[in-house]
A protein has these predicted regions:
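FNR/FR-type flavoprotein reductase catalytic core
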Residues: 85-205
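Local cysteine-cluster metal-coordination motifs and their immediate loop/turn environment
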Residues: 182, 201-230
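Short Fe-S-cluster ligation motifs
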Residues: 8, 224-245
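Glycine-rich, flexible loop/turn motifs
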Residues: 60, 95, 99, 196, ...
Length: 245
């Protein structure tokens, strides 16, 4: 099992941070990776809630990442006024973090599959555990950005399905998937004999269990993404028919 004991002991309750954007880089169409001047401690799998008061909206959740094991980062896909504000504002961002439960895998022998909107988290996991990073995107990625990091890129739905069928599942103890619900469900159902973890990206307004907006149905009953997740075993979300060898 990956050793997180020292970091878990250092974990403190979430608090508010004011973050200054260092670089805003377009990864693919309408999707950006933002790095920050400041830093704070968090563990893989955790997320933050970003204030968008300037847009008159509630906070928005984003998974946390770190580039080159140093730079705090998030990935943001512009899907409305709130995310557009986060990308374009010149003001410091008010961020509540770290939130959610950390992802502590049973070994370092895994692989990460993410959509561009979750790429900061994907890079962080890949570098942290020294494991393959695979990006599944509907559109081409910024070539200059791709060259900075070790990743394989698959573009289009057909390419993603081919990836799931051709990936050497037996080489890994686990697969981590973060993207859309459809993307995650396809991974779980196309790899029924593999331990697949999914990082659910659900609407939520608070991130601390108060609003109950992120409730999801699991095989163990209703869970809340912010306090029970955001990372779940995929077969706890979608029932799968396992194949015998």
């Amino acid at each position: 099992m990956a050793n997180f004991s020292a970091e878990l002991k250092k974990q403190t309750k979430y608090k508010a941070f004011l973050l200054t954007k260092r670089i805003v880089e377009e990864i693919t169409q309408n999707t950006y990776l933002i790095t920050f001047e400041e830093d704070f401690d968090f563990l893989p799998g955790q997320f933050c809630m970003v204030s968008v008061d300037g847009a008159g909206l509630t906070r928005k959740p984003y998974t946390l990442g770190r580039l080159n094991k140093m730079e705090l980062a998030i990935s943001v896909k512009i899907a409305g006024k709130g995310s557009e504000y986060i990308v374009k504002t010149n003001e410091k961002l008010n961020v509540l973090a770290p939130l959610g439960n950390p992802f502590i895998p049973e070994s370092n022998n895994g692989a990460v599959i993410v959509a561009p909107s979750c790429l900061a988290e994907g890079i962080h996991l890949s570098e942290r555990f020294d494991i393959p990073l695979i990006v599944a995107s509907k559109t081409e990625l910024n070539e200059k950005f791709v060259k900075k990091f070790k990743m394989r890129v698959f573009v289009g739905n057909d390419e993603y399905l081919n990836l799931l069928s051709e990936l050497n599942h037996s080489a890994f103890d686990w697969i981590f998937v973060s993207g859309s619900r459809v993307m995650e469900e396809l991974a779980v159902k196309n790899m029924p004999n593999k331990v697949v973890y999914v990082s659910l990206n659900e609407y939520m307004a608070c991130g601390i269990g108060a609003c109950k907006g992120c409730a999801v149905e699991t095989v163990h009953g209703i869970k809340h993404v912010c306090t029970d997740g955001p990372v779940f075993r995929g077969d706890n979300i979608w029932q799968v028919q396992r194949h015998s060898d």
